[in-house]
Amino acid sequence: MRTLEHLFGAESPASGRELLCDRTFDLSSVASARAALAEHARARGLTDIDLTKFVLAVHEVMINSVRHGGGGGRLLLWCTADALHCHVDDDGPGIPPSLRNLRRRRPPVGRIGAGHGLWLAGQVCPGVRITDRAGGGAEVCLTYPLPGRGGPDQGAAAPGNCSPPGSGEASASGRR
């Protein structure tokens, strides 16, 4: 079993969590990354609307990385006892503060770069955390509760509970 310590060392905040998926992506590989994500999420118990919501949220963040974050990024997926966690990072300019309020009103239709993807991710995924990487780029961590093991009202998907690997040290991608 590959663990996050294997990639980031024993000091990783995600210590003891099994790494399910670690892959870089660009426009040509978003579909295969999304399929792998769905397969892992299904294997961990997400079905129907929960599976659709989680995969949609991660897909929107990946597309943002392709469009606005330098042409691609890196996706890490891991599981804890009560939730799936997905970390996406890129080498773009970061995400403007005005687009980080995921509970804001729907962005205007027809404006590219207005934050539709982040807004949608925030609507369908109970836990979304957006941070800037030192030296440039964005990190988005999505947390989705596993069925019967907790829920948003029980804190399983609170955005603060999603500790991306290597936070406070090197980024999850090792790209600083």
Indicate residue ranges for each PLM-predicted region.
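Short beta-strand-loop-beta element adjacent to the nucleotide/active-site pocket used for signaling
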Residues: 79-86
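Conserved short strand/loop->alpha-helix "switch" segment adjacent to the catalytic nucleotide/phosphoryl-transfer site
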Residues: 31-59
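Glycine-rich phosphate-binding loop
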Residues: 110-125
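Glycine-rich/acidic phosphate-handling loop/turn and adjacent ATP-lid/helix
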Residues: 86-114
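A conserved short beta-strand within the histidine kinase catalytic ATPase domain
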Residues: 71-78
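Flexible, glycine-/charge-rich segments associated with ATP-binding catalytic modules
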Residues: 2-24, 123-176
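STAS-typified acidic loop motif
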Residues: 19-35
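Short helix-loop "hinge" at the ATP-lid/N-box region of the Bergerat-fold HATPase_c
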Residues: 65-66
